[in-house]
């Protein structure tokens, strides 16, 4: 067998083609699908964010009880003529809110609050439709990456659960002498909305990078920052729920002073529950405290201070990250927290004026997403080039 002679000066590998790097099998064939699913998730994210904002405006305009039936499908069509409007108005006039708060309301006034609630529910239907079309479409085309279909299916299941909780919340305001929904049910509804929004955002962040990139990045994760941002997620969620409890009983309007609460640190009658003796061992007393404006407003303020303080401390740790993108994420989060503090104080001083209150709610969404973004970069750092200064 002849042996090919080689010059002693021939470079290693000369004359042979270097193998072309191939993407890992974990990503092969799914790059386009990942981009498509990510765009779909981003559309869902924007819709859910709009749903939260419209829900807040529906509450602030006291429109949430204008539709007294739950018709997930047929309710998509609003009243189209005078007869249908009159029938819808008659249903509302049978509600305790009309009898006790809005007696004498005209049809035109009813239509204004009706459209807010109908728009809120219609947006929920649109979200369900966008999810179903996207999920079934990607599933039928077999474009969902391995292991992802349960996560995407879970989003739809949570969306359906959220619709049921929404009606459960509304139904609480149609009983007895109620003129508003139960604040605890409102908090459940808003809390689940933020959970859904967070899951969508997290999955979109994961799909923004290949599986192989994420696998390599995770080897350089910054464990301390992951832990700190996880703590921040818990505190932020608690603050969101407390904010919903405040909004549910209009507690923000009762104490329009800051940093005090109507001249005192602890509001008067903070632990008073009508008809229930003050007893730390009585569950009814604890539940009653959630209806005490001073109690929930005080907790909301204290949780806000805690969130701001932790955010500042964690920002100091975040600035020590060796990755520029991670440091930038913590910078953005710190600035958003400062802005949210100002919006919170403004909401208090304006006695929850709707423009300031809704901006405060949007601020909560922004902070929620920025915390998740910071946690994502702590868990999956973007490793750049030292020469280019991107570390």
From Swiss-Prot:
Keyword Transmembrane helix: yes
Pathway: Porphyrin-containing compound metabolism; heme A biosynthesis; heme A from heme O: step 1/1
The entry's keywords: Cell membrane, Heme biosynthesis, Iron, Membrane, Metal-binding, Oxidoreductase, Transmembrane, Transmembrane helix
Compartmental location: Cell membrane
Domain of life: Bacteria
InterPro entries named among the record's database cross-references: COX15/CtaA_fam, HemA_synt_rhodobact, HemeA_Synthase_type2
Residues that coordinate or bind heme: 300, 360
Catalytically driven reaction(s): Fe(II)-heme o + 2 A + H2O = Fe(II)-heme a + 2 AH2
Protein task: Catalyzes the conversion of heme O to heme A by two successive hydroxylations of the methyl group at C8. The first hydroxylation forms heme I, the second hydroxylation results in an unstable dihydroxymethyl group, which spontaneously dehydrates, resulting in the formyl group of heme A.
PANTHER family: CYTOCHROME C OXIDASE ASSEMBLY PROTEIN COX15, CYTOCHROME C OXIDASE ASSEMBLY PROTEIN COX15 HOMOLOG
Protein name: Heme A synthase
Originating species: Cereibacter sphaeroides (strain KD131 / KCTC 12085)
Annotated gene: ctaA
């Amino acid at each position: 067998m002849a042996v090919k002679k080689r010059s002693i000066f021939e470079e290693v590998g000369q004359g042979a083609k270097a193998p072309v790097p191939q993407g890992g099998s974990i990503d092969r064939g799914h790059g386009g699908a990942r981009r498509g699913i990510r765009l779909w998730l981003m559309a869902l994210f924007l819709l859910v964010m709009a749903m939260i904002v419209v829900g807040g405006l529906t509450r602030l305009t006291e429109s949430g009880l204008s539709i007294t039936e739950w018709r997930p499908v047929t309710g998509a069509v609003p009243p189209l003529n005078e007869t249908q409007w009159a029938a819808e108005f008659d249903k509302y006039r049978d509600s305790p809110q009309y009898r006790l708060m809005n007696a004498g309301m005209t049809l035109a006034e009813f239509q204004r609050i009706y459209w807010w609630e109908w728009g809120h529910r219609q947006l929920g239907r649109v979200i369900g439709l966008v999810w179903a079309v996207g999920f079934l479409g990607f599933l039928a085309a077999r474009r969902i990456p391995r292991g992802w279909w349960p996560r995407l299916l879970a989003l739809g299941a949570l969306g359906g659960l959220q619709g049921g909780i929404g009606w459960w919340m509304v139904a609480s305001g149609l009983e007895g002498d109620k003129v508003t929904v139960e604040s605890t049910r409102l908090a459940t509804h808003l809390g689940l909305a933020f959970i859904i929004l967070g899951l969508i955002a997290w999955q979109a962040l994961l799909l923004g990078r290949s599986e192989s990139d994420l696998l390599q990045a995770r080897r350089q994760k910054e464990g301390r920052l992951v832990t700190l941002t996880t703590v921040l997620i818990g505190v932020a969620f608690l603050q969101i729920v407390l904010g919903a409890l405040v909004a549910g009983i209009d507690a923000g309007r009762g104490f329009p002073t800051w940093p005090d609460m109507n001249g005192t640190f602890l509001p008067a009658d903070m632990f008073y529950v009508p008809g229930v003796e003050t007893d730390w061992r009585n569950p009814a007393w604890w539940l009653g405290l959630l209806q005490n404006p001073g109690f929930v407003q005080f907790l909301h303020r204290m949780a806000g201070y805690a969130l701001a303080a932790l955010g500042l401390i964690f920002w100091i740790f975040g600035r020590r990250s060796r990755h520029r993108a991670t440091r930038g994420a913590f910078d953005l989060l710190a600035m958003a927290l400062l802005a949210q503090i100002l919006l919170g104080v403004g909401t208090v001083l304006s006695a929850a004026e709707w423009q300031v209150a809704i901006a405060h709610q949007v601020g909560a969404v922004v902070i929620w997403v920025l915390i998740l973004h910071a946690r994502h970069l702590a868990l999956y750092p973007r490793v750049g080039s030292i020469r280019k200064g991107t570390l």
